[in-house]
Amino acid sequence: MTDLCNLRCRYCMPDGVDKLEREDILTYEEFLRLAALFARCGVDTVRVTGGEPLVRKGVEQLVKGLKAIPGIRKVTMTTNAVLLEQQLPALLEAGLDSVNISLDTLDPALFAKITARDEFAAVQAGIHAALESGIPVKLNCVPQVGVNEGELEALAALAQDKPLQVRFIEMMPIGYGAAMPCISGPELLVRFRRRWPELAPLPGAACAALGDGPAVYYTVPGWKGDIGFIAAVHGKFCASCNRVRLTSQGFLRPCLASEAGCDLKALLRSGASDEELLTAIRTTIWEKPQEHHFELKQDIPATRGMYRIGG
């Protein structure tokens, strides 16, 4: 819903990137019109992302509008949590169902190095507020070679006494992350099992209950939370992928690794009817590529930042 962010993580949106013009971004009314059409196609879950969604004013009104759409059963948000503590009450009142929080380190100095901002205390306050509120919380960590790889066990251990899911997402070869080496999910699982030999996978039904996507979850008896792995490169899950992404500019992308898609904003602003938009949405979804080829690291523009796609 926005390309703006109040952090500058080097693998997503480093300093110096160009901002989009305001008129290039979909309005909330346009987002809601499209969301209602997606619901007519069978979409029942919407995740609000950015950039950082909380930097866009009135985001709680978007959440409220999404929750009012027939067929939409769940609205979630991915955030860096810098502004979460102050905005959480309004989001909860609007009906937000869960929150995913990006966190790559528990070290304030390393946090500042990764993000180029000194906001660790604000993020911790946001996480604490979310846990205290009772809303389901997931933490998303991107393991980075030579950066935070020594902290991954400490991050995983948060699930021991907190009711949350700590997920480890492989670095995707997209945009600024393409030049960075990947710590694979299977490699990380071996490491964690050396630390916690009792770490065992949750049954499929339990995994499904925790989320709507590709994460595979593990836990240790007695833990309050779980550890998840999203291994897009080393554990390709294309056959079961149930995602499409609508960028802040209104471009519908059926696959992160593909340039294929449809400019829904152009259709919206040229006066397209709902039926014409539905046809475009359905056609794009049906043309979703069979699988990605992240392992080949080709045909993916090096400057296509995740902050503009929906990270």
Regions found by a protein language model. Name each.
Residues T2-E29:
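Canonical Radical SAM [4Fe-4S] cluster-binding loop centered on the CxxxCxxC motif
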Residues D3-C5, M13-G16, L103-T105, E170, ...:
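Short, small-residue-rich loop/turn micro-motifs
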Residues M1, L20, E52-R56, Q144-N148, ...:
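Short, small-residue-enriched loops and turns at beta-alpha junctions
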Residues R8, C12, R56, A109, ...:
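Residues that scaffold the ATP/ADP-binding catalytic core of kinase and kinase-like folds
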Residues I25-V48, V55-I169:
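Radical SAM/AdoMet-radical enzyme domain recognition
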Residues L7, P108-A109, K236, C262:
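Glycine-centered loop/turn positions within well-structured domains
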Residues V17-R22, D107-I114, G175-A179, D263-L264:
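A short acidic, helix-capping loop that chelates divalent metal ions and anchors anionic groups
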Residues D161, M171-G311:
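Auxiliary Fe-S-binding modules of radical SAM enzymes
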